[in-house]
From Swiss-Prot:
GO molecular function: fluoride channel activity; metal ion binding
Protein's gene: fluC1
Transmembrane segments: 5-25, 39-59, 61-81, 98-118
Disulfide bond entries: none
InterPro entries: FluC (IPR003691)
Protein name from the UniProt record: Fluoride-specific ion channel FluC 1
Organism: Listeria innocua serovar 6a (strain ATCC BAA-680 / CLIP 11262)
Length: 118
């Protein structure tokens, strides 16, 4: 049982570090109201998680990669906070684009990941 917690924790720490690195890199390249870093992270995360859940990985790999790594990598809470910040700035065009594209592209990416993993 302890090994399961360690697998999830180690995977999450690696995923969070990758998310942080990507976020820093993207924000240094693109200065815009659209939150490209979080968008990229969540779309690639949707694809990767879709792929992982459709493969024949063992339960320990699912814990490490699916629950841990992908849980640390993707960020639903940042998506919501950035959405609220856009609302508070009354930047509705970017807000609706961000929310709509995140949900639409996330579903498509997860579907493609699942299809490729089967």
């Amino acid at each position: 049982m302890l090994i399961n917690f360690l697998l999830v924790g180690f995977g999450a720490s690696l995923g969070a570090m990758l998310r942080y690195g990507i976020s820093i890199f993207v924000k240094s390249k693109w200065k815009t109201d659209f939150p490209y870093a979080t968008f990229f992270i969540n779309i690639t995360g949707s694809f990767l998680l879709g792929f992982l859940v459709s493969t024949a990985l063992g339960p320990m790999w699912q814990l490490f990669l699916g629950t841990g790594f992908m849980g640390g990598y993707t960020t639903f809470s940042t998506f919501k906070v950035e959405s609220m910040e856009l609302k508070w700035k009354a930047n509705f065009q970017v807000l609706f684009s961000y929310v709509g594209l995140t949900y639409l592209c996330g579903l498509i990416a997860a579907f493609i990941g699942i299809m490729l993993g089967v």
